[in-house]
Amino acid sequence: MSQADLLAQDPVFQLKGSMLAITVMELAHNDLDRLDAQLTEKVAQAPAFFSNTPLVLALDKLPEGEGELNLAELMAVCRRHGLRTLAIRASREGDIAAAEAMDLPVLPPSGARERLLDPAPKKVEEKPAEPEHKPSRIVTSPVRGGQQVYAQGGDLIVLAPVSAGAELLADGNIHVYAPMRGRALAGIKGNTKARIFCQQMGAEMLSIAGHYKVAEDLRRDPLWGDAVHVSLSGDVLNITRL
């Protein structure tokens, strides 16, 4: 076999699954001027968070009566504030057509999958399958800036300090029995019952099921630096003393 044949068989790429933390911006109104002003305030509070942040624009909750959305201008507003649009979530034909014209991926609207999967009435009652139980992932060494630790299908327990710039991800709960200065994202697949437990809250960001608070918000909390328990109530993160 010649060298050219060997090179032809040598793979030049691999497709790998990856769990990425991506911010979803859910628009409630088609008002780009107000959006620009409110984003300016948010960026002033947390400039590091708005630095080349990947974004999904959720347009499926926009009221029908507010007119056609200028998607290109919306993306330009986001770009000016450091938000990089990767895809949109939409149901209106105009929004979908605009995205396709820009070669921008379109995700199904929130709840569409659940509606499609509504089962027909069953003649025979079936016992639901037992959920697969995965053991907690336990980390005993410090998690340093730039590192990412993910507990798939379960809880993440960290027994050492978490530095600024580090990221903890879990499908379930996150426990940090040491100073917590990085990011903690629990329930990343939508588990709204997930919790975060910190022995010393000094985090850059705390998030449960996509609802988050950044350091600028957390520092104003009277429990900053204390042992806390974080839970989700509706769309609001509740922080209480442990």
UniProtKB/Swiss-Prot annotation:
Coiled coil feature spans: none
Database matches in InterPro entries: CAP/MinC_C (IPR016098), MinC (IPR013033), MinC_C_sf (IPR036145), MinC_N (IPR007874), Septum_form_inhib_MinC_C (IPR005526)
Keyword Cell division recorded: yes
UniProt entry keywords in alphabetical sequence: Cell cycle, Cell division, Septation
Region annotation (Disordered) ranges: 120-144
GO biological process: cell morphogenesis; division septum assembly; regulation of cell division; regulation of cell septum assembly
Subunit composition and interactions: Interacts with MinD and FtsZ.
Protein name as it appears in the record: Probable septum site-determining protein MinC
